[in-house]
Amino acid sequence: MTSPQTNSLDDIFGSSPPHEGEKFSQQASIEAPEPSDLPSLRRQHVTAGYRDGVSAAKGEHVQHGFDAGFPIGAQLGMRAGTVIGIIEGLLRGFESPTASRAVKKPLQRKEEGQGVETDEAEAARQAKREQLLRLYQKAVKELEVRSVFAGSEEESTRDNGGQEKPEVVLRRKGDAVISQWEEQVRVAHWEENMAALEPKEDEKRASTPTEQI
């Protein structure tokens, strides 16, 4: 069986039967296009899945992060509060005027040179107060939370590529800052004095009168 004779004008008027390659191209072009709302629907599902994944991850890891980070923050906060409290107590002591004493002595005639010594003592007290005030303002600024933990993320990434636990980095960073202030204020010395002033438990029991039946 011979193939049908092709006419040179078939390409123009389209009277000749289509070839096999032409059938395939025509079928591909006739296929229905993808609905226009399908890409938008896909994006919505991806967004919803992403949000669900974030919520699930938060539920699993937030409690672990709280358990690991809260004790460290509480410990460092107590140490920083002790430093600021000591400086604040000293500052209040120097702010207390001499005239506010509970028992006032009767006025006496000033002897020669007594007024000069009083003025010098007052000037020294004011100078010490100004020094403590500057120290107090500096401590409040440097022991603020953002200042204590500043650069923790960069330090962790630089040292071990972010492999170290965040709470370990925060503890090391905070301890380095607060320890400097503890040495400057001599917190250990103040704690020893406070411990010596506190009555022992045995002394409390001995001084407390026993009830008689």
UniProtKB/Swiss-Prot annotation:
BP GO annotations: protein maturation
Xref: InterPro entries: Essential_protein_Yae1_N (IPR019191), Yae1-like (IPR038881)
Annotated GO CC locations: cytoplasm; nucleus
Biased composition (Basic and acidic residues): 155-170, 192-206
Cellular compartment(s): Cytoplasm; Nucleus
A matching Pfam family: Yae1_N
Keywords tagged on the record: Cytoplasm, Nucleus
Coarse class of the protein's main subcellular location: cytoplasm
Region (Disordered): 1-44, 102-122, 150-170, 192-213
UniProt-annotated stretches for the region deca-GX3 motif: 49-89
Residues annotated as transmembrane: none
Keyword Cytoplasm: yes
Disulphide connectivity of cysteines: none
Similarity comment text for this entry: Belongs to the YAE1 family.
Function: The complex LTO1:YAE1 may function as a target specific adapter that probably recruits apo-RPLI1 to the cytosolic iron-sulfur protein assembly (CIA) complex machinery. May be required for biogenesis of the large ribosomal subunit and initiation of translation.
Description of how the protein assembles with itself and partners: May form a complex with LTO1.
The name this protein goes by in its record: Protein yae1
Protein encoded by which gene: yae1
